[in-house]
Every structure is written in structure tokens, then in C-alpha cells.
Amino acid sequence: MEITALQAWRAIPQTRDIVDYFRGIFDVIGVTIEETGEELTIALEAEQIRIDAGLPENPDFVVPLKWENVENMVSHAEDGQIDSHESWRIVSVLFTSLTQATLYNPIMASDIGRRISRVEDLAHVYLIAPDGHEATCHTLAYLKKQWLVIPGLYGKPKRTFRMTAEDSIEYQRRVFSAIKNNSFREWWRFSRWYKKWRKTVSVKH
């Protein structure tokens, strides 16, 4: 009998390094597997990552995966640790889904939110591999009071971001914290941090 994604991922060692790697990136996500039609819930708990069949009722976001992504995750985590190259491989899979989930938040999509953070309405974003090559990329476009996250590069950007996996994870943890707490103070703190962080990972045109 062929192994399922649920069985494969439940066999991954639940080390502190593995659990802490994902802490702050999400609380609960849904995962769909293209080839098998499986739907899974991935929930971060105090000491472990819980993996159940079926999609959660209120996921932070849903990630569509292929079977090769399932096998790669097993390979990345089989030694109980995630190195920089493995981190890049993981983030490159989550990259667009993470961006969509955070930018679709009402605060991030509002004109006020954009003005507070001084976010341009058209940007190109590159995820840089450990060897320095530009790998995954997408376009962020603000149109009719909503963000569009489009795989690939389109239009003439007003800003270009070039981020490592570590940069992307730091951003996700900061913005996810602001979304969870959802207070003026948290969003103000995020805005101040973002404007400083942006200078280290982007160029304005």
C-alpha cells in the first residue's frame, strides 16, 4: 500500500529545532496535495506540530503542494534540523501563499495600512537562493483596493525586493504577530520595523 502524505509527515522527527523553525510563521494552515487529493491540517502546538486529515475551519492560509513537495519536506527534516539550503527550499514553496495570506488581511489591504507603511502599489519580489541566484519571484500589485500576488514578473516596479529565506521568515513572523494581535500599537510597531527592514532588502526605482 502506498504511503500517504499524512503518514509521511507524521513520521518526521518532532525535534525542538523543527518545531521552533515554524513557530511564529503560522498557527494553523491547510495543505492540499495535487496528485492524491489529500487535504491536511498542520497546527503548531506548544511542543509539537499536529498533523491531521482534513482542512481546518479557519486556517491562516492554505498551501497547494505537489507530491514532490511532500517528499522534499521529509528529506529536509529527517535529521531533525533545517539548514540554510533546506530553509530556502521550504520558503520557496510557501513564498507566494505566505505573501497572499498576509496581504489579503483587511489592514494590509487598506489605503490607511499602505500609507502607514509607505508601500508602493507595484513591486517585484525575488527570493534569493543560498548560492546568490535569484530563484522564486512574484509581482505585488495594488489594484481597486486589493492586493494581487502574481507568480512571475510583470510591469515596471516602483520597488524591487531581493530577500533570502531568513529575510522572508523574519518578515512573516513580524507581520503575522501584528495580524494576530491586531491592535494599533502592534501595527504601529510593525510599520516602524518594516520601514527600517525594507531599506536592507529592497531598492526604490
Predicted regions and their residues:
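Feature captures hydrophobic
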Residues: 1-205
